[in-house]
């Protein structure tokens, strides 16, 4: 962290080690191996293929530097979402800490741990987007942090999608933050 080693990180034990994983951008998450927030999100969908046509991928981010979030608040949201027709992303560091993804519960021993930010990812069919957005709006005011939401879909062969008109009908103002052009490729697998 410090080029002259004047500041050295302390060795942390469980459950405090969770704080470093979610708060230190140079430490990779053990569950995913990804640095920063521990997930590639849908930014790399052209390579990962996590979200297909007719589907929507959500990123629900909790906390920010200066605000933070406790896992207890994240659990309120994951439990609120779990009963909907969604699937939590398994390649996500918060998913790795869920004791029961079916109910959205998170490990009891980390609920009071506070981190700078964390992202929950999920996927659903496009027709369920309004229901997911309504649930996020319902639960978010109960949390002692801020919540940011992103939603993405895969465009069709003409570059169009059904998500934009759906969001407009629901009254959401949005900006197309990133468009994958399909230039990314999966890494080649070495053959013997």
Residue ranges and their predicted role:
Residues 8-12, 85-95, 145-152:
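Flexible, glycine/charged-enriched surface loops at secondary-structure junctions
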Residues 64-72:
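Short, surface-exposed ligand-recognition loops at beta-strand->loop->(often short) alpha-helix junctions
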Residues 17-55, 73, 78-83, 98, ...:
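Long, contiguous binding/interaction regions
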Residues 1-15:
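Iron-sulfur cluster-binding cysteine motifs and their immediate structural context
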Residues 55-64, 118:
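Short glycine-/aliphatic-rich beta-strand segments at the starts of folded cytosolic domains
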Residues 63-65, 93-94:
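Histidine- and/or cysteine-centered catalytic micro-motif in compact active-site loops
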Residues 122-129:
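Helix N-cap motif at beta-to-alpha junctions
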Residues 115-122:
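Short, well-ordered beta-strand segments in beta-rich or mixed alpha/beta enzyme
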